[in-house]
Regions:
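Membrane-embedded alpha-helical bundles that constitute the cytochrome b-like, heme-associated redox core
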Residues: 1-120
Length: 120
């Protein structure tokens, strides 16, 4: 499997997330962009899992430490991102803290994906 989609999907999700943060700071909410960010992030996680575990009938790539940890961080970012609109309505501080945790886990996952891809 080529590495281009594996690197392009998380970077595209991260770039769109940066746009969404700027819009959030301006008080603008774009549900279509949020949905696209969700699809790109879950697509990146899916490609990573397929690379780690292998497609049906094939073997996966050697995961090493970076691959498994990257999958964990991306899964954590997806989980926090899905919970943020639900739990973040309680207070602005809670929403911003969850958004910071989502961004931190996502950036760590993307950087570990790149590190893992460069070590293959």
């Amino acid at each position: 499997m080529p590495m281009v989609p594996f690197i392009a999907l998380p970077l595209a999700a991260m770039a769109l997330g940066l746009v969404l943060v700027v819009l959030h700071l301006r008080g603008i909410r774009k549900p279509l962009l949020i949905g696209l960010h969700l699809l790109l992030g879950l697509g990146a996680l899916e490609v990573l899992v397929v690379l780690l575990k292998g497609a049906p009938g094939s073997d996966g790539l050697p995961a090493g430490d970076f691959g498994n940890v990257a999958a964990g961080f991306l899964a954590l970012a997806a989980f926090i991102g899905l919970l943020t609109p639900i739990l973040g309505r309680r207070s602005r501080l809670t929403g911003n803290a969850m958004l910071l945790a989502h961004v931190s886990a996502g950036v760590a996952g993307v950087l570990l994906c790149i590190a893992w891809a460069s070590s293959l």
